[in-house]
């Protein structure tokens, strides 16, 4: 396991390894918050630790975890300056979420909405909302998140069900899910409109 980080400049160029800070772990999630900062959280052997990242890309030491320790969650920004972690697994799959304030403080568990799952993707869309989607091993449903951090019930999945996908915003108000694993690695992508509709 590693705790290295790699900075990416505004041209998309990835820099060399930066010596790790905090607990080395895998299967964690990360999102931006506070307009210009980021947070890593959860992962490893069922951890709830977080690590804040300042607006220079410097990763801070571990912050004692809040909420259910788990691995395989997803995270996204919402509401322009906040973030949300959601889903994951311990011995079984989970559906709770944890909101992150504009100052990087993680709140306690919020009762889960939608299908419990892990190893899914999440991204911001629409300027101030978020979407969770897909999940281990062949799930394809999505859950929209309002600009106040409320997660909606399952939306019937579109596209290939898969786990271990990634997601990101693009174009200022849209999102994209890509890649994943169904039993073998796949390279499909699914675009998300600025109203949260997932395309085939």
Regions inferred by a protein language model and the residue ranges of each:
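Polar, enzyme-active/binding microenvironments
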Residues: 1-200
């Amino acid at each position: 396991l590693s705790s290295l980080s790699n900075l990416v400049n505004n041209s998309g160029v990835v820099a060399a390894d930066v010596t790790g800070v905090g607990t080395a772990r895998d299967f964690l999630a990360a999102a931006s918050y506070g307009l210009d900062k980021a947070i890593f959280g959860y992962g490893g052997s069922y951890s709830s630790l977080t690590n804040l990242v300042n607006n220079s890309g410097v990763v801070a030491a571990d912050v004692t975890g809040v909420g259910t320790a788990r691995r395989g969650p997803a995270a996204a920004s919402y509401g322009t300056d906040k973030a949300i972690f959601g889903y994951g697994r311990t011995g079984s799959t989970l559906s709770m979420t944890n909101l992150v304030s504009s100052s990087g403080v993680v709140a306690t568990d919020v009762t889960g909405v939608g299908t419990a799952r892990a190893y899914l993707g999440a991204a911001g869309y629409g300027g101030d909302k978020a979407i969770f989607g897909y999940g281990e091993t062949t799930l394809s449903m999505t859950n929209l998140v309002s600009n106040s951090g409320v997660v909606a019930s399952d939306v019937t999945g579109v596209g290939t069900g898969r786990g271990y996908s990634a997601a990101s915003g693009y174009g200022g108000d849209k999102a994209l899910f890509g890649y994943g694993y169904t039993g073998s690695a796949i390279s499909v992508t699914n675009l998300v409109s600025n109203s949260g509709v997932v395309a085939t």
